[in-house]
């Protein structure tokens, strides 16, 4: 099966997730193409693939602008394929944040007029060493809002790799024999 993975990333966690999914699918014997949506080439056609996975992350209550542009621009091609949307956010790291994470997905899909076959809410990562003071304050006081953040320095990854792999397997092979 030919699978296309298209992603947008801000701090690199969505790229890491997309690479993980690509490796998982290749190991299962699938042919995989991995592309950043900003690097999309006009001679590359979604129609060549059996399934399409799009991944993006939430920052300041919305997904990346390039993903917001990409999806509507390719909506007719996406509509004819089984598609999976992986939305990465810190809200998905906490049970009480899942509803908010879903709200950002719903807003994105409504604006894009896209109805993927499936949606995965994946927890992101904290990268304190890459944040300036302003971004660190947003993370602490808006995103985390008193939640435990596993420390205040370095990188803290919240992605549940097994759950992600299980969701991707179910999408690619919905009827395992």
Question: How should each PLM-predicted stretch be described?
Answer:
Residues 2-28:
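N-terminal beta1-alpha1 ligand-phosphate binding loop
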Residues 3, 32-33, 83, 117:
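Hydrophobic anchor at the start of a short beta-strand
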Residues 6, 35-37, 122-124:
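Conserved beta-strand termini and adjacent loop/short-helix elements that scaffold enzyme active sites
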Residues 8-12, 39-40, 57-61:
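Short, surface-exposed acidic/glycine-rich loop or hinge patches that mediate macromolecular interfaces
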Residues 16, 49-52, 56, 60-177:
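FMN-binding flavodoxin-like domain, especially the glycine-rich phosphate-binding loop
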Residues 24-29, 173-177:
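Secondary-structure boundary elements
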Residues 28-41:
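A short beta-strand-loop structural module common to alpha/beta enzyme folds
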Residues 41-47:
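Short amphipathic alpha-helix with an adjacent loop that forms part of the alpha/beta core around
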